[in-house]
Amino acid sequence: MALQFTLNQDAPASAAVDCIVVGVFADKTLSPAAQALDSASQGRLTALVARGDVASKTGSTTLLHDLPGVTAPRVLVVGLGEAGKFGVAPYLKAVGDATRALKTGAVGTALLTLTELTVKARDAAWNIRQAVTVSDHAAYRYTATLGKKKVDETGLTTLAIAGDDARALAVGVATAEGVEFARELGNLPPNYCTPAYLADTAAAFAGKFRGAEAEILDEAQMEALGMGSLLSVARGSANRPRLIVLKWNGGGDARPYVLVGKGITFDTGGVNLKTQGGIEEMKYDMCGGANVIGTFVATVKAELPINLVVVVPAVENAIDGNAYRPSDVITSMSGKTIEVGNTDAEGRLILCDALTYAERFNPEALVDVATLTGACMVALGHQTAGLMSKHDDLANELLAAGEHVFDRAWRLPLWDEYQGLLDSTFADVYNIGGRWGGAITAGCFLSRFTENQRWAHLDIAGVASDEGKRGMATGRPVGLLTQWLLDRAA
């Protein structure tokens, strides 16, 4: 964890921490904790705000030192923007801004009082849970492969959260741990995070907790199951594939929820080789797998009273003389044959076998998560995942969960009129659908392997990682999925 978290009910003026975090609205109205500090300092905070020494616009932070009558040597004032517009997004931004302001420097411990604020259509427990997940996300530092590069070890280590709801704190910490677990896997370079490494890491986590278990299928076992589609993608790589199966048994005899995550640990594109200007980011093509593993971590840590199964086909799409080719016809585990139109449309080829495998668990609901198409990113950008399902109830559950935690998805159609774009002369289905509607035709392809399931597909190509040299894995949609499971456990 990037941070350690505690609950704190001390009066702000007497809290024994390095820094107190309070807020101020654009109209110069102080948050309740800020009012308490203002009273303790005999109006000092009000005076500083009035003369413009403390900014109140959204995104601003002002660090004050030695406020009279306040035990903490520092007070961080966070701008909250207009009071009438204050809601979910401004609250989450304020928490993140505060954490980033204290990420480096002399402050080791802080008390976050922003949880006392009223957020429209949310309760105090939500405030605490989201404060934990957002602040841990903001404080995250990647260090796994830095070698001799110096890491700034100063800054915030412990964040006390104003409030008394221990369960809300525990769920927030569990979710944050799941997000961070997923981000760490996603950020690792592909020479580290191979299919075997991903499998070993997931199994090692499951082995630490009663009620959790892992099964790792190797190439021979997958071949015996008839997973010809998945294994075709794996043929060109020296890093052999694994099928990761994780189980959390928290719900007695109830049917499990099943998450399937695309785990392409690096995607060259295969024979249809990717070009420079994007291939260097293809280590993130396993983020669907990383994020369903992260959701498993959150579920186990929160001890949710449900049954959960996670399935991750972990494969590297590489090139050698044995690599699969465009125009190959391969046979999936379902028995359906697939004509390969493009070897860079490999995610759906590993997912179709994993989805077929998942049927054996008799899922209450089946959701796959994948960085599946650039087309989804073109359509929706980096702000939202794409959601496809023929089951309105399931789609609405996922959409509501995403809205609740601001890890949102947007529903795209999955109409039968698109299915004809996948017709093949030489096989049951073609693995690409042409230039138009690429995200939707990818979803249509997967729908052919989930016909008897209550199923939804999340295309996370736009939200799984930040772009550019300094970009990192985001851990999305661990928040959405964890909230969805929390709702099912309620």
Curated annotation (Swiss-Prot):
What's an example Gene Ontology biological process for this entry? proteolysis
Question: What family is it from?
Answer: Belongs to the peptidase M17 family.
Where is this gene product found? Cytoplasm
What name goes with this protein?
A: Probable cytosol aminopeptidase
| Sorted UniProt keywords | Aminopeptidase, Cytoplasm, Hydrolase, Manganese, Metal-binding, Protease
Q: Which InterPro entries match?
A: Leucine_aapep/pepB (IPR011356), Macro_dom-like (IPR043472), Peptidase_M17_C (IPR000819), Peptidase_M17_leu_NH2_pept (IPR023042), Peptidase_M17_N (IPR008283)
The Gene Ontology terms for molecular function here are:
manganese ion binding; metalloaminopeptidase activity
